[in-house]
A protein has these predicted regions:
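Acidic/histidine-rich catalytic cores of soluble enzymes
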Residues: 15-22, 150-265
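Hydrophobic faces of well-ordered beta-strands that scaffold small-molecule active sites
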Residues: 16-24, 47-49, 84-89, 123-125, ...
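Catalytic domains of carbohydrate-active enzymes, especially glycoside hydrolases
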Residues: 33-53, 118-119
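A structural motif
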Residues: 44, 115, 120, 228, ...
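Glycine-rich, proline-tolerant flexible connector loops at the mouths of alpha/beta enzymes
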Residues: 48-74, 127-133
Length: 304
């Protein structure tokens, strides 16, 4: 299902746990190329590059993901000294709308091919919701939601295998794959050499379980650690209302996300320990930082 676990015996306890990266759209405004260079100047070693950011920057759609653009971006990446950890194609693979799913699969076809042209980086995807509007609702907990997602994912994995790149799912409370156990179920049901996981530990939390975050992390690593290829890092606070969409669970509170280390609510140190033992130097992309905080978030992760 995943690559063999790495042996970190020679790395030593002081080896960096992570290659720390940033989402390109969390940097100051600018073109894709300007932001890639900025990431390198700020000391990041990898980036998450969303396809929608590429489309907006170059005024293209998926048909513009061609060899010339890939060569242009590779040159800038080399100049900046960074690599693409994840090329994002976050489409709803659990939709019941057959036409919508077919259209999304064409996006995955284009994005997996482009990822191969970029050098073989992973393509990242969400785990969807079983309604055509992609709305957060209780239908995501139903067995039928898992059936729908696994069916769509299997098709996307075939495209990733054909392109020779990994396809990584990112579990989250607001989506179909919303617990460590459901992630394991997907990995068992979808038999693909391309399939792996982006693990964002905060994305699997919600107010009712936030105090048990260490147990959620333990279960995720025990059940799915062999498939984790990239980490996402953020922090959170719990606020006493459910006035807007977010990490809500009917408790009257919701999680509001911040950059890694900003609030101190989530301790990323156990993930650093795991990475040193199992995935030394794993790409770890900061989420929910801002131009004012992304360097401090980077330093927090590098200091673990």
């Amino acid at each position: 299902m995943g690559a063999p676990l790495c042996d970190n015996a020679a790395a030593g306890s002081t080896a960096p746990a992570f290659n720390v990266g940033v989402r390109l759209h969390d940097l100051p405004e600018g073109s894709v190329e300007k932001r890639i260079l900025m990431a390198g100047e700020l000391g990041f070693t990898c980036i998450q590059l969303p396809s929608k950011v590429v489309y907006k920057s170059y005024g293209i759609d998926r048909t513009g993901l061609d060899e010339d653009l890939a060569a242009r971006l590779r040159a800038v990446l080399d100049e900046a000294g960074v690599h693409v950890a994840v090329f994002g194609c976050y489409k709803n693979l659990a939709t019941p709308d057959a036409a919508q799913l077919a259209e999304s699969l064409e996006d995955y076809r284009a994005c997996t091919r482009f990822a191969a042209l970029l050098g073989g980086c992973a393509v990242g995807t969400e785990t969807g919701r079983p309604n055509a509007g992609n709305k957060v609702a209780d239908d995501r907990f139903e067995p039928a939601a898992m059936d729908a997602f696994c069916g769509g994912l299997a098709n996307a994995c075939e495209l990733a295998e054909a392109a020779g790149v990994p396809l990584l799912i990112e579990p989250g409370w607001n989506e179909v794959v919303n617990t460590p156990e459901r992630c394991r179920e997907v990995l068992d049901r979808v038999d693909s050499t391309a399939l792996g996981v982006i693990y964002d530990p905060v994305s699997l939390l919600h107010p009712t379980v936030a105090a048990q975050s260490a147990d959620v992390v333990r279960r995720m690593l025990e059940l799915n650690g062999d498939a984790i290829r990239v980490l996402h890092a953020k922090d959170y606070e719990v606020v006493d209302n459910e006035d807007s969409d977010g990490w809500c669970d009917g408790s009257g509170s919701r999680l509001v996300c911040h950059g890694a280390g900003e609030t101190g609510a989530f301790d990323f140190a156990p993930l650093a320990d795991w990475a040193r033992k199992v995935r030394p130097g794993i790409d770890c992309v900061i989420e929910n930082s801002t131009p004012a905080t992304n360097v401090a978030c980077r330093d927090y992760l590098l200091g673990l």
